[in-house]
Amino acid sequence: MNFQQQGYRATKPRARASPPTGGPMLFDDTSSGPPPMNNQNYYSSGYNMAEMPAGGQEPGVGNIFADPMANAAMMYGSTLANQGKDIVNKEINRFMSVNKLKYFFAVDTKYVMKKLLLLMFPYTHQDWEVRYHRDTPLTPRHDVNAPDLYIPTMAFITYILLAGMALGIQKRFSPEVLGLCASTALVWMIIEVLVMLLSLYLLTVHTDLSTFDLVAYSGYKYVGMILTVFCGLLFGSDGYYVALAWSSCALMFFIVRSLKMKILSSISADSMGAGASAKPRFRLYITVASAAFQPFIIYWLTAHLVR
């Protein structure tokens, strides 16, 4: 009996019993390799859905925007930012209006050519009055008599470049010398404008001249300075002094005729008002002194460049 059972076991081994299909499994069957991942579910789906908020957002992110206190803080911060921006723009417009600055750069090629000819040959020009349209002065591109800041700015840059070239030709170029030349020219223009403003204020001269107007008229001298230095480099000292005399006379004539329409023309308007204390001869002194000062500045800023 035992022999038959042992022989039966040797010739016919017992087959592994398959697990029941319907009942739960206490242990995983690892004999045929790892089971697929999608068959394992150690956590309930209800628990996972409770941990993840709707919309796929991380916990706590949606609560910030849903919090009334956070929304109020954001609105208050944006209000403070807008108020600060308005205050900054108001202070900037108080000292330098952007719209007024755009007016002085509203030029075109035709205006630039006419203005340069007027600066070099002002003797044949007849009409010096600035034109208006509905109590607003026309832009420089529509009126050659209107002051601009484009020509003074470009002339100042060209003067600095020409000064660097002149110093390089004479083997005297260095960044320090060129920087000193540029700063000196800029400081002289600032001093001239400040003296002009102070004179108008002390003499109680009521005029429509703005600070930008004075900067423009003061900056036109750089055109004559460019001509003077260029002629000095080409023709030596003789060419320099001839160009200096021509550009100085032309600039003085231009300044007198232009400021005459701004300063002297307001005498009749102020004769019945508070500006009557400013006598006409004082206004004439301001105009003539501003024009007579130009040749000395031109000579001071160009003589060291031509040797």
From Swiss-Prot:
Compartments it resides in: Endoplasmic reticulum membrane; Golgi apparatus membrane; Endoplasmic reticulum-Golgi intermediate compartment membrane
Region (Disordered): 1-42
Transmembrane segments annotated in the record for this chain: 149-169, 185-205, 214-236, 240-259, 286-306
UniProt family annotation: Belongs to the YIF1 family.
GO CC terms of this entry: COPII-coated ER to Golgi transport vesicle; endoplasmic reticulum membrane; endoplasmic reticulum-Golgi intermediate compartment; endoplasmic reticulum-Golgi intermediate compartment membrane; Golgi membrane
Membrane-side (Cytoplasmic) residue stretches: 1-148, 206-213, 260-285
Protein known as: Protein YIF1A
Keywords: Endoplasmic reticulum, ER-Golgi transport, Golgi apparatus, Membrane, Protein transport, Transmembrane, Transmembrane helix, Transport
InterPro entries: Yif1_fam
Ranges per topology, Lumenal: 170-184, 237-239
Membrane association type: Multi-pass membrane protein
Chief localisation class: endoplasmic reticulum
Domain of life: Eukaryota
GO biological process: endoplasmic reticulum to Golgi vesicle-mediated transport; protein transport
Species classification: Eukaryota, Metazoa, Chordata, Craniata, Vertebrata
Function: Possible role in transport between endoplasmic reticulum and Golgi.
Record-linked PANTHER family: PROTEIN YIF1A (PTHR14083:SF2), YIP1 INTERACTING FACTOR HOMOLOG YIF1 PROTEIN (PTHR14083)
